[in-house]
Amino acid sequence: MRTIAILAAILLFALLAQAKSLQETADDAATQEQPGEDDQDLAVSFEENGLSTLRASGSQARRTCRCRFGRCFRRESYSGSCNINGRIFSLCCR
């Protein structure tokens, strides 16, 4: 009877240790990829002369580009990729 109690205690201790390591892994994964952070990593604005040859007035178009994890939003177009701290993101411009 004492042996069964000791084996049960060892089994419970092993399950508890495994549950803690799984929780730590889940917490690490949750802190690495928070929704909403993806579009805040990098924002780039620049002037582009591409439309000035088509317009007589010579006005310049302004584009705003962001590095996003995953796909671009509806009104954005994919314009390349970004490498930030070894992670690859989509360069999305509008």
Curated annotation (Swiss-Prot):
InterPro entries: Alpha-defensin, Alpha-defensin_C, Alpha-defensin_N, Beta/alpha-defensin_C. It is found in: Secreted. Residues 1-19 form the signal peptide. Disulfide bonds join C65-C93, C67-C82, C72-C92. GO terms for cellular component: extracellular space. GO terms for biological process: antibacterial humoral response; antimicrobial humoral immune response mediated by antimicrobial peptide; cellular response to lipopolysaccharide; defense response to fungus; defense response to Gram-negative bacterium; defense response to Gram-positive bacterium; disruption of plasma membrane integrity in another organism; innate immune response in mucosa. Keywords: Antibiotic, Antimicrobial, Defensin, Disulfide bond, Fungicide, Secreted, Signal. The keyword Transmembrane helix does not apply. Residues 20-61 form a propeptide. PANTHER family: ALPHA-DEFENSIN 1, DEFENSIN ALPHA 5. Belongs to the alpha-defensin family. This is Defensin alpha 4. It comes from Macaca mulatta.
